[in-house]
């Protein structure tokens, strides 16, 4: 009898939590979106595309994930900023997102070649996670050419060694 009561209470609490999440307008994450969330974490996407992520040891509210950063990355290529991927995904279809992952050669320090070499299913899963997360934040600052001085803060990369 006690076991039945404990199970019934657990189910009631779980059902209440699910109902409250539904009332708040939170939608259930699909298996593909969950996989995309996992890939985002293990591939290090948050390291640059989520402000404060590395500094906090990854303790940034998920509502802020992948909203870009105002920290610039300055080197011989100019100054680049990590894009707000949640806004980028809102502007693209899934097919366009995959095509961009395959064809874009982005400026450093973005490891575009890692994204290019991901399996289509992984890129699609990331897209589905971004769509699930929805739009948030502001667009990243615009690229600054090498001959222009960027506004701080930025990380200064040294020039490559001369050959």
Where would I find each of the regions flagged by the language model?
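Positively charged n-region of N-terminal signal peptides that target proteins for export
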Residues: 1-4
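Bacterial N-terminal signal peptides
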Residues: 8-15
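Sec/Tat signal peptide C-region and signal peptidase I cleavage site
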Residues: 16-21
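Flexible coil segments in periplasmic/lumen-exposed cytochrome c-class electron-transfer proteins
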Residues: 24-31, 42, 50-80, 95, ...
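Local sequence-structure signature of Cys/Sec-based thiol-disulfide redox active-site neighborhoods
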Residues: 37-43
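Short, cysteine/histidine-rich loop/knuckle motifs that typically chelate Zn2+
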Residues: 47
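A structural feature that tracks compact, well-ordered secondary-structure segments
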Residues: 86-88, 99-101, 112-113
């Amino acid at each position: 009898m006690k076991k039945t009561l404990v199970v019934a209470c657990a189910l009631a609490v779980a059902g209440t939590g699910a109902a409250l999440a539904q009332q708040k307008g939170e939608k259930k994450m699909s298996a593909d979106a969950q996989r995309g969330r996992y890939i985002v974490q293990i591939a290090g996407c948050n390291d640059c595309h989520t402000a404060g992520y590395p500094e906090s040891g990854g303790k940034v509210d998920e509502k802020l994930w992948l909203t870009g950063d105002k920290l610039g990355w300055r080197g011989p290529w100019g100054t680049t900023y990590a894009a707000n991927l949640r806004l980028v995904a809102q502007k693209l279809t899934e097919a366009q997102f995959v095509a961009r992952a395959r064809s874009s050669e982005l400026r450093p320090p973005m490891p575009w070649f890692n994204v290019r070499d991901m399996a289509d299913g992984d890129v699609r899963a990331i897209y589905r996670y971004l769509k699930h997360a929805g739009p948030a934040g502001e667009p990243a600052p615009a690229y600054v050419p090498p001959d222009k001085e960027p506004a701080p803060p930025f990380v200064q990369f040294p020039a490559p060694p001369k050959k």
